[in-house]
């Protein structure tokens, strides 16, 4: 995918663990303001790809560029500070904290001081903390979490905790969201609501989104473009409708789900 300005680019990523080739010369690009899907069967290398993009893993070969800058050697926190925000398949929320506390904790990635310093009001941070609390309330309301703002994450249903996880990602004021199976564990109604949220984040906030997802109807509905991995390699790429018809994709991953997935061309030029 080469149209428009590139927000994220990976070139020739190769990752090995001992004798296991996890990623094999993988390249992809994500254009600014687009929603791009990363799909494939279990063990295809999707999460390992995310780990390389965000700096958790250091690949043996390849490079990663973000917002026009080579970030290949930057640690995870520096990439986050540059504007990458990630959600996790197993959630990044802290169960012992309330929704508000989780969101405010995520905000501290962009404050220049620690959450502990903010909690204690050290160095005049109390004024900034007041601003953060106001911003956190706006984010919480945006995601419809106002009624549970003071509830500990451990007491919330799984779907609500996933929404909290996304609110935390947005709280870091990112340029790009990397979402790891955002629809996992959601009901069909919740997945439909998620699709609307993702489109609004793209259209209203101009966020760029790359998401790993097994929920084929969601991918078909919201993604402008899709990359398909299999055994650590790029199997194919294209618009959702093209991917759904691709015989190798059907054989490797989609199977009968392709016939029932709704959605067509993405409507982009």
Features from the language model and the residues they span:
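Glycine-rich phosphate-binding loops of nucleotide-dependent enzymes
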Residues: 2-269
